[in-house]
Amino acid sequence: MRIGHGYDVHCLVEGRKLILGGVDVPYERGLLGHSDADVLLHAIADAILGALALGDIGKHFPDTDPQFKGADSRKLLRHVMALAGQKGYVLGNVDATIVAQRPKLAPFIPEMRANLAEDLIAEIDRINVKATTTEQLGFAGRGEGIAAYAVVLMERR
């Protein structure tokens, strides 16, 4: 078995949708990025790639490549899981934390978990997503951006 850790952060801007865990979260701002900027899925993808010593999402999906402009991060995550499968690994579990002062994310977590279970080819009881604030400290606390952390356990098939 292998363990991986992932992290991602994007700034909040007007004129973009807020996509987290593949869910369109109603909010007045969204995350800026080359793709849909889904920090949760990016952190999880990075954790999987790290666990399997396959680099990071910047290596596999560079922001300089126009084919990934506006990309759906769920498709990117499914590609990462296909790479894991080629190496003979499946997901053991994932534990992820979204760091955002606003909006409140608890109502959206069940749908995020369902999306992740589908994309990671895993039972939902192997998927945990939490959301926390920073008590108004730092960039997240000031509402400048949203971050996500993820830890995964990958197991041999």
Curated annotation (Swiss-Prot):
<feature type="binding site">
    <location>
        <position position="139"/>
    </location>
    <ligand>
        <name>4-CDP-2-C-methyl-D-erythritol 2-phosphate</name>
    </ligand>
</feature>
<feature type="site" description="Transition state stabilizer">
    <location>
        <position position="34"/>
    </location>
</feature>
<protein>
    <recommendedName>
        <fullName>2-C-methyl-D-erythritol 2,4-cyclodiphosphate synthase</fullName>
        <ecNumber>4.6.1.12</ecNumber>
    </recommendedName>
</protein>
<keyword id="KW-0479">Metal-binding</keyword>
<keyword id="KW-0414">Isoprene biosynthesis</keyword>
<feature type="binding site">
    <location>
        <position position="142"/>
    </location>
    <ligand>
        <name>4-CDP-2-C-methyl-D-erythritol 2-phosphate</name>
    </ligand>
</feature>
<dbReference type="InterPro" id="IPR036571">
    <property type="entry name" value="MECDP_synthase_sf"/>
</dbReference>
<feature type="binding site">
    <location>
        <begin position="132"/>
        <end position="135"/>
    </location>
    <ligand>
        <name>4-CDP-2-C-methyl-D-erythritol 2-phosphate</name>
    </ligand>
</feature>
<comment type="pathway">
    <text>Isoprenoid biosynthesis; isopentenyl diphosphate biosynthesis via DXP pathway; isopentenyl diphosphate from 1-deoxy-D-xylulose 5-phosphate: step 4/6.</text>
</comment>
<dbReference type="GO" id="GO:0016114">
    <property type="term" value="P:terpenoid biosynthetic process"/>
</dbReference>
<feature type="binding site">
    <location>
        <position position="8"/>
    </location>
    <ligand>
        <name>a divalent metal cation</name>
    </ligand>
</feature>
<dbReference type="InterPro" id="IPR020555">
    <property type="entry name" value="MECDP_synthase_CS"/>
</dbReference>
<comment type="similarity">
    <text>Belongs to the IspF family.</text>
</comment>
<comment type="function">
    <text>Involved in the biosynthesis of isopentenyl diphosphate (IPP) and dimethylallyl diphosphate (DMAPP), two major building blocks of isoprenoid compounds. Catalyzes the conversion of 4-diphosphocytidyl-2-C-methyl-D-erythritol 2-phosphate (CDP-ME2P) to 2-C-methyl-D-erythritol 2,4-cyclodiphosphate (ME-CPP) with a corresponding release of cytidine 5-monophosphate (CMP).</text>
</comment>
<feature type="site" description="Transition state stabilizer">
    <location>
        <position position="133"/>
    </location>
</feature>
<dbReference type="GO" id="GO:0008685">
    <property type="term" value="F:2-C-methyl-D-erythritol 2,4-cyclodiphosphate synthase activity"/>
</dbReference>
<feature type="binding site">
    <location>
        <begin position="61"/>
        <end position="65"/>
    </location>
    <ligand>
        <name>4-CDP-2-C-methyl-D-erythritol 2-phosphate</name>
    </ligand>
</feature>
<feature type="binding site">
    <location>
        <begin position="34"/>
        <end position="35"/>
    </location>
    <ligand>
        <name>4-CDP-2-C-methyl-D-erythritol 2-phosphate</name>
    </ligand>
</feature>
<dbReference type="InterPro" id="IPR003526">
    <property type="entry name" value="MECDP_synthase"/>
</dbReference>
<dbReference type="Pfam" id="PF02542">
    <property type="entry name" value="YgbB"/>
</dbReference>
<dbReference type="GO" id="GO:0019288">
    <property type="term" value="P:isopentenyl diphosphate biosynthetic process, methylerythritol 4-phosphate pathway"/>
</dbReference>
<feature type="binding site">
    <location>
        <position position="42"/>
    </location>
    <ligand>
        <name>a divalent metal cation</name>
    </ligand>
</feature>
<feature type="binding site">
    <location>
        <position position="10"/>
    </location>
    <ligand>
        <name>a divalent metal cation</name>
    </ligand>
</feature>
<comment type="subunit">
    <text>Homotrimer.</text>
</comment>
<keyword id="KW-0456">Lyase</keyword>
<dbReference type="GO" id="GO:0046872">
    <property type="term" value="F:metal ion binding"/>
</dbReference>
<feature type="binding site">
    <location>
        <begin position="56"/>
        <end position="58"/>
    </location>
    <ligand>
        <name>4-CDP-2-C-methyl-D-erythritol 2-phosphate</name>
    </ligand>
</feature>
<feature type="binding site">
    <location>
        <begin position="8"/>
        <end position="10"/>
    </location>
    <ligand>
        <name>4-CDP-2-C-methyl-D-erythritol 2-phosphate</name>
    </ligand>
</feature>
